[in-house]
A protein has these predicted regions:
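Catalytic Walker B motif of ABC-type/P-loop ATPase nucleotide-binding domains
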Residues: 123-126
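Conserved signature/switch motifs of ABC ATPase nucleotide-binding domains
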Residues: 97, 118
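Conserved ABC ATPase "signature" region
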Residues: 74-93, 146
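Conserved H-loop
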Residues: 152-158
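Short helical segment in ABC ATPase nucleotide-binding domains corresponding to the A-loop/adjacent helical element
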Residues: 59-67, 77, 81, 170
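ABC ATPase NBD coupling module
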Residues: 31-44, 68, 73
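Helix-to-loop junction immediately C-terminal to a conserved catalytic motif
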Residues: 14
């Protein structure tokens, strides 16, 4: 239900807020002992309606963390092209556009691949498909499942839709 703490839980996992009690462990390590920047750069985060930076091109949105990390420009470009291909979007056609020039489904695809661009071990998804039409939503659910299988990431997916949870998840926690 609304207000039960789903989004708050994601924010605690990536240390945007501090838990009032208890501990959160990742691979047996308390997240409070992990440097916040290091923790967050090892976590992709996808929010409802993409959360793309409107003043940046699609390329800039996808590549921002890799550039902050100082990765090789050629490798960044190749990774961006590979990720675009994985979600069936033509890099030449879309990378120089701005988020406002994309449909809602395209923006969500970019949000997902931006979360994956720095090759994080974990991806947090906070109702990423809730504002989309049923056909786009179903298509993105399938694409996310395929990405999960191909990339082998731990994904924590928040949704109000039990059918969506059953379709995507291999484990479900009900709050």
């Amino acid at each position: 239900p609304s207000g039960c703490g789903k989004t708050t839980t994601l924010k605690m996992i990536n240390r945007l807020i501090t838990a009032s009690s208890g501990r959160i462990l990742i691979d047996g390590e308390d997240i409070e002992s992990i440097d916040k920047v290091k923790l967050r750069r090892n976590m992709g985060y996808v929010i409802q309606q993409g959360g793309l930076f409107p003043h940046m091109t699609i390329r800039q949105n996808i590549e921002i963390i890799e550039k902050l990390e100082g990765k090789d420009e050629y490798q960044i470009l190749k990774n961006t092209e590979r990720l675009m291909e994985m979600v069936d979007m033509d890099a030449e056609k879309f990378l120089d556009r701005y988020p406002s020039e994309l449909s809602g489904g395209q923006q969500q695809r970019i949000g997902v691949i931006r979360a994956l661009a720095n090759d994080p071990d974990y991806v947090l998804l906070d109702e990423p498909f809730s504002a989309l039409d049923p056909l786009t939503r179903s298509s993105l659910q399938d694409e996310l499942s395929d990405l999960h299988r191909k990339m082998g990431k731990t994904m924590i997916f928040v949704t109000h839709d039990m059918d969506e949870a059953i379709k995507i998840a291999d484990r479900i926690c009900i709050m």
